A protein has these predicted regions:
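Zn-dependent metallopeptidase/amidohydrolase metal-coordination segment
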Residues: 197-234
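Non-catalytic positions within long, well-ordered alpha-helices that form the structural scaffold/packing
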Residues: 93-94, 185, 204
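Active-site rim beta-loop-alpha module in soluble metabolic enzymes
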Residues: 138-186
């Protein structure tokens, strides 16, 4: 199969550092959010200043600098789906990013996970294509190998319950059939999203630290689909508070570097 043809050669015909150059004083940590409405809310709340841009056929995508608790961070809106998400962060890394903290929603495969509940993935099922260009073929990839303890302490400090487990990364959300969901649950999956496996593989390949956490949205562990808070306007205040947890983790990482 083509997906088994992993090539470890890092020098491609087109390399990200051909397109993007280092940005002076670029923050070490990039915090990224998928929801456009939520992203703009947080940028405005933290008084973000544009420091760079990426460009593609869909338009111009600003990179912002924000300050949270006296620490500087970059903010960038994540793109939906593994190829777009990975490609955009390939553009960001040459600017100077050393780690990425990614926040997004997910569908749950376990109905006991509450709406907007926090999920920390520990491994991802690689049911997409992008990760196979960055890592040898396998069904799973371990994710969040660093900073889990730090994030758990953030959640406990702020009184957020959470679950940990396997996520299913897929390319085709309209092909989440009942039989496929059952098989992924047998593999241990408790939720489904579209980017985690590929982002971890790319960051491993590029030597970049990566941490992703999810908040539960629609419920697929049911005879029919239950969208719950999947809408970008639903429970927005709760999601804003969840988004700030990413910055709490980023601060904890920065403070740990100073110890």
């Amino acid at each position: 199969m083509l997906l088994t043809e992993f090539d470890c050669e890092k020098n491609a015909v087109i390399n990200p550092d051909i397109i993007h150059k280092p940005v002076e004083n670029f923050p070490d940590t990039v915090v990224s959010i998928f929801s456009n409405r939520l992203f703009q809310k947080i940028v405005d709340f933290l008084g973000g200043t544009e420091i760079a841009q990426t460009h593609d056929v869909d338009g111009i995508w600003p990179v912002y600098e924000v300050t949270y608790q006296n620490h500087r961070f970059a903010m960038y809106k994540a793109r939906l789906g593994a190829p777009a998400c990975v490609g955009c962060f390939e553009d960001i890394i040459p600017m100077g990013a050393k780690r990425i903290i990614l926040l997004g929603n997910c569908g749950v495969l376990d109905r006991s996970i509450e709406d907007c509940g926090i999920i920390i993935p520990t491994r991802a099922i690689r049911d997409e294509g992008t990760s196979y260009h960055y890592a040898p073929a396998s069904d799973f990839i371990d994710v969040n190998r660093k900073y889990v303890d730090e994030f758990r302490s953030v959640l406990e400090k702020h009184g957020y319950p959470y679950v940990m487990g396997t996520t299913w990364t897929t390319d085709a959300f309209y092909r989440e059939t009942h039989s496929k969901i059952a098989r992924r649950k047998e593999m241990g999956a408790i939720c489904v999203e579209m980017e985690c496996a590929a982002m971890q593989a790319m960051c491993d390949f590029r030597g970049i630290e990566f941490f992703q956490f999810l908040y539960a949205a629609d419920n697929l562990d049911h005879s029919s689909w239950d969208p719950r808070s999947l809408s970008g306007t639903s429970r927005l205040e709760d999601k804003e508070k969840i988004a700030l947890l990413a910055f709490e983790l980023a601060c904890k990482i920065e403070e740990g570097k100073l110890c």
